[in-house]
């Protein structure tokens, strides 16, 4: 599955990968970690009135206690994903963190799945 592929790629950096919003208030934030969110999965191309591909749209977040790492790791993730067939535009954007000790950055990525 596409989501599993994305998680496996991000895990190669050695940081935990979680679904966005799944850390509980009681759970301590890891020092650095990725989260992902599937924004939508739309039909791509069609043939004979049926979809023959799908476009997966994800947001990837990286949070860390090290602001410099936040800026570099999201670009590293972008480069890895592009090498593996993902479409990634730009260098990302800042995102808020629920913990004052962490800063975050995110990128939006697309993947075309062919049937």
Describe the function of each predicted region:
Residues 1-47, 73, 99:
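Small/polar-rich, solvent-exposed N-terminal microdomains that initiate assembly or binding
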Residues 44-51, 113-115:
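Short, basic, helix/turn surface patches
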Residues 45-49, 61-66, 87-91:
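Short, surface-exposed, polar/charged, turn-prone segments marking secondary-structure boundaries
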Residues 49-53, 75-78:
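Short intrinsically disordered coil segments
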Residues 52-65, 102-113:
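Oligomerization/assembly interface segments of phage tail-like spikes and tubes
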Residues 67-73:
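Short, conserved charged micro-motifs
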Residues 75-115:
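Acidic-leaning, charged glycine-interspersed low-complexity segments
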């Amino acid at each position: 599955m596409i989501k599993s592929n994305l998680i496996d790629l991000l895990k190669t950096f050695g940081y935990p990968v979680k679904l966005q919003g799944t850390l509980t208030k009681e759970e301590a934030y890891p020092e650095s970690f990725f989260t992902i969110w599937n924004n939508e999965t739309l039909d791509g191309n069609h043939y004979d009135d049926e979809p023959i591909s799908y476009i997966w749209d994800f947001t990837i977040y990286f949070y860390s206690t090290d602001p410099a790492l936040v800026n570099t790791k999201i670009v590293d993730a972008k480069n890895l994903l592009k090498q593996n067939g993902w479409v990634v535009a730009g260098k990302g954007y800042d995102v808020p963190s629920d913990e004052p000790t962490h800063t975050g950055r995110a990128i939006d990525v697309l993947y075309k799945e062919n049937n």
